[in-house]
């Protein structure tokens, strides 16, 4: 008898496993210092120092219609935007915090505009939401693996009401699922150490997600990240195991299968250069040829590719990124039949490339 979680996962991901190619967009306050999205953690930056970027954020050239047209031209079938990253800054008008785009000089609900623009182009839409929040006072500070203040003795012995934080987190997710229309993907990030599964009250959370938007496809990072994928690879996955596995910056050598050897949905999330968020001096871009080869390899192994771009502080996707994506789109215009709706061909890999097969 088929496991109900697996059965529902298969039904939900039918469109997703045909789409194959998506756009990831990491954008937030960290685009202002322009040293990557982990700048606050990497530099142990105090909240007060980071706040100056909040006061500067105007996103004057943000035009999501241009982003959406670029994604369509590149042949991307879905797109995911960081509604909130680890720094806790919301690109939408959350009623649970003042740390949001509508309170910056920008004064815009950037998520709402993104969703409308991409829907208008016929592109499926998703939102990334960080389970981690370095802004919230009740998220663990001292001794945490990643928090900017993890080594700051001032926070040693500080009591944090983690249940209060979880209430805040769940409320914000409920906002996104309630106030922003039909979402195709919710991309949670991430679990680490003992911060996984029921530490996030994942059963309660997933019940809410499925009640509000039963169709929405979610990743596996409520339970595991990276090599610790969680129970999605087993024959008895938890209800919060996710609908797809999410290897980062790599392609699994043989794709991803469960314990019985059955293919499970997966998506390689890969950056176009070496950072997710905008980095002014990162010019290590992948060529369009390499992007195409990466996409073909993913599809040949029954997986998706979500390729990341990091807009600058004004809301502009770097020109180099635009040029690469347009070139990839030219290839897909001629060869998309070998990508969309295709997967593992059940044939040995040839010396000259890869096989894909259209799903019947």
Report residues per predicted region:
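Mature catalytic domains of secreted/periplasmic carbohydrate-active enzymes
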Residues: 1-360
């Amino acid at each position: 008898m088929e496991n109900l979680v697996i059965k529902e996962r298969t039904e939900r991901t039918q469109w997703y496993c045909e789409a194959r190619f998506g756009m990831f967009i990491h954008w937030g306050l960290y685009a202002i210092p322009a040293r990557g999205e982990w700048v606050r953690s990497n530099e142990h930056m105090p909240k007060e120092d980071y706040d100056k970027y909040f006061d500067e954020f105007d996103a004057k050239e943000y035009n999501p219609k241009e982003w959406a047209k670029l994604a369509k031209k590149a042949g991307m079938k879905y797109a995911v935007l960081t509604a909130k990253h680890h720094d806790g800054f919301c690109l939408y008008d959350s009623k649970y915090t003042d740390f949001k785009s509508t309170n910056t000089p920008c004064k815009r609900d950037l998520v709402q505009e993104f969703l409308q623009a991409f829907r208008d182009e016929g592109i499926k839409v998703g939102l990334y939401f960080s389970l981690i929040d370095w802004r919230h006072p009740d998220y663990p500070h001292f001794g945490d693996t990643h928090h900017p203040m993890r080594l700051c003795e001032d926070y040693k012995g500080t009591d944090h009401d983690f249940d209060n934080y979880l209430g805040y987190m769940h409320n914000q997710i409920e906002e996104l699922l309630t106030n922003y229309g039909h979402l195709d993907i919710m991309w949670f990030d991430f679990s680490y150490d003992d911060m996984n599964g029921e530490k996030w009250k994942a059963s309660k959370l997933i019940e809410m997600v499925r009640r509000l938007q039963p169709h929405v496809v979610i990743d596996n990072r409520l339970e595991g990240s990276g090599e610790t994928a969680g129970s999605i690879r087993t024959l008895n996955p938890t209800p919060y195991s996710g609908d797809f596995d999410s290897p980062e910056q790599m392609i699994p050598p043989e794709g991803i299968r469960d314990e019985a050897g059955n293919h499970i949905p997966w998506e390689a999330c890969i950056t176009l250069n070496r950072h997710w968020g905008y980095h002014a001096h990162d010019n290590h871009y992948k060529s369009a040829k390499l992007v195409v080869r990466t996409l073909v390899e993913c599809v040949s192994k029954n997986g998706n590719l979500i390729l990341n771009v990091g807009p600058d502080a004004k809301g502009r996707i770097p020109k180099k990124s635009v040029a690469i994506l347009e070139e990839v789109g030219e290839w897909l215009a001629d060869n998309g039949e070998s990508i969309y709706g295709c997967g593992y061909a059940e044939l040995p890999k040839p010396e000259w490339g890869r096989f894909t097969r259209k799903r019947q």
